[in-house]
A protein has these predicted regions:
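N-terminal, intrinsically disordered, polar/charged segments of Gram-positive cell-envelope systems
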Residues: 16-55
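Short loop/helix-cap segments at secondary-structure boundaries that form the rim of catalytic
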Residues: 119, 139-140, 156-161
Length: 169
């Protein structure tokens, strides 16, 4: 396992910080749940349904949501664009240390990482084009990590600078 590296994003927050465990009205799409991570491909991650809100602990900031923890068992996590009709704008306090986690697709509304870290079991992470700075995120095991993003984006530049495999979407 290789050492860690650090990254972060400029973000915004809300005013009302109500801590919640999500009670999702969504049904977990059984076809989207993958149990054998040895069979997962990057295309599986790209085509995977959003992870149900019930799999996350989050803070309601009033006009937005910050994800605190992932409690699901699916090795693929697709951060939802919204929870309870509010944009998911940040990941805080290292919620992605779940040992079953292999693949993460970050939502396009995501603006901030606050001391977030990803376990050494993570194999693929999709960084949307809007991500332009990673300063407060730690990846462990980056020698086995693949960053997926737009060609010519910050994600590609970052991957090359850090010696991480990059795949254009």
């Amino acid at each position: 396992m290789s050492g860690a590296f650090v990254m972060g994003l400029v973000g915004c927050g809300g005013t009302d910080s109500s801590d919640k465990s999500a009670e999702s009205k969504e049904n977990n799409n059984s076809e989207a749940f993958v149990t054998d991570s040895a069979e997962i491909t990057v295309d599986d991650v790209r085509n995977h349904a959003e992870t149900p809100a019930s799999d996350f602990e989050y803070i309601d900031n009033g006009d937005s949501v910050s994800i605190k923890a992932y409690n699901g068992s699916d090795p693929i996590v697709v951060i939802p664009e919204q929870i309870d009709g509010k944009d998911v704008i940040s990941i805080i306090n290292g919620p992605f240390s779940n040992d079953s986690l292999k693949y993460v697709d970050l939502g396009y509304n995501l603006k901030e990482f606050d001391d977030a870290y990803f376990s050494d079991t993570l194999e693929v992470i999709h960084l949307p084009a809007r991500v332009e700075n990673l300063d407060k995120v730690v990846f462990f095991g980056e020698d086995t990590l693949t960053i997926v993003g737009k060609a010519g984006s910050f994600a590609e530049t970052f991957a090359k600078e850090e010696g991480i495999k990059f795949e254009a979407e």
